[in-house]
């Protein structure tokens, strides 16, 4: 296992992995600090190091992310895996939600209409993963 902070660049293979159609597990913390883990689709912007998850406002993952301000996204495919850790914030701004929906549509499919949609934005601070996906140069 390798670990880097985001000042270390993800390899081209890692960026490709993060654009392939895979689901991930989103971990947030409940009020009692126990983990809440759910399967999600997400997108990652390598320029800003922001991962985005679209969800319904008031969902448990949104409530947890808003309260604790922490989240981890873990994606795995065979021996390849990455965990993206960082500060989470829930954004209900219509332009931010629209942008997140467009990004989601590029990676997965057009999301169904949802007037209560928000976006969980995770500012990635640390990356763990299989050594072949991390560039420590």
Swiss-Prot record:
Effect on the protein upon substituting residue 108 to A: 44.5-fold decrease in catalytic efficiency
Listed result of changing residue 108 to F: 3.3-fold decrease in catalytic efficiency
Enzyme class: oxidoreductase
Localization, UniProt: Cell surface; Secreted
Stored Pfam families: PNPOx_N
Keyword Secreted: yes
Quaternary structure, from the entry: Homodimer.
Protein name: F420H(2)-dependent biliverdin reductase
């Amino acid at each position: 296992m390798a670990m880097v902070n985001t000042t270390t660049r993800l390899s081209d293979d890692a960026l490709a992995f993060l654009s392939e159609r895979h689901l991930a597990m989103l971990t947030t913390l409940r009020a009692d600090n126990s983990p809440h883990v759910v399967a999600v689709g997400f997108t990652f912007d390598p320029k800003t190091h922001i991962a985005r998850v679209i969800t319904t406002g008031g969902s448990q993952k949104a409530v947890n992310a808003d309260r604790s301000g922490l989240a981890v996204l873990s994606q795995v495919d065979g021996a390849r895996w990455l965990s993206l850790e960082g500060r989470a914030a829930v954004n209900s701004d219509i332009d931010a939600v629209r942008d997140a929906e467009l990004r989601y549509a590029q990676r997965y499919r057009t999301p169904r209409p949802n007037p209560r949609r928000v976006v969980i934005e995770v500012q990635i601070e640390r990356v763990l993963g299989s050594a072949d996906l991390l560039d420590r140069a």
